[in-house]
Amino acid sequence: MNSRTLGRIESRSRRSESGSTRKAIFLRNNVIKVPNLSRKDTQLMGETILLDAAKGLTLNELKFWDYKFDNILNQFFTEWRIWICCPENLRHLLAPIRQFGFTEKGIPYTIMKKMEVFTEEEADDFDCTYACCSIDELGDILCEDYDVEVWDNFGDDVWSLCNKFGLGIADFDSNCGNLGFEYEGEAEIKRVRFIDYGFKIHGGKDNRWNPVISELISA
């Protein structure tokens, strides 16, 4: 994996075999989040993400607050294709998502069908190594392969996790489950960063799920 510091969101174009140009967003250290707009502006969220990403802006300081999830990401993934490159030991997590559209945590097919998965060798020019799965699934792999312990990131568990491992919280909203943290580990992994797209389903405090984009940077 590439150990260079990756600190910006970049947008590029890649020409497919058929000759058509497909946009690709490269998620680096930063997570795409959107400004804390009023609910009436929800329909504009996708356009906001595209505009900011196209400018190459750093968005990790902006907060993803309480918005209707589908309005944002369905519009977002309709226009943009996410290119995901992941290590071989994580790639098997993506196969069932691509085939069936849902994981145990409920990641919707409307998101995953827009993604394409590559090995590192297939995507060297992308300069990224990302996997997308639930935090529980990714946590199991990391615990097994890298001796890093993580667990569900809702409610008080977040604070327990951070206190136990001395993790630094980058952004957390107890209502929506937004969290970004880093763990300075050993062995092959220098930094493990989990950043999730959190949202609230009205009518139940814990009736929600979070897809996770995790970055693994080698020492």
Question: What are the functions of these language-model segments?
Answer:
Residues 37-39, 102-103, 115-118, 177, ...:
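Short, solvent-exposed loop/turn segments at secondary-structure junctions
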Residues 30, 93, 110, 188-195:
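Protein kinase-like catalytic core scaffold
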Residues 1-13:
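Juxta-kinase regulatory segment immediately upstream of eukaryotic protein kinase catalytic domains
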Residues 10-86:
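ATP-binding glycine-rich loop module of kinase domains
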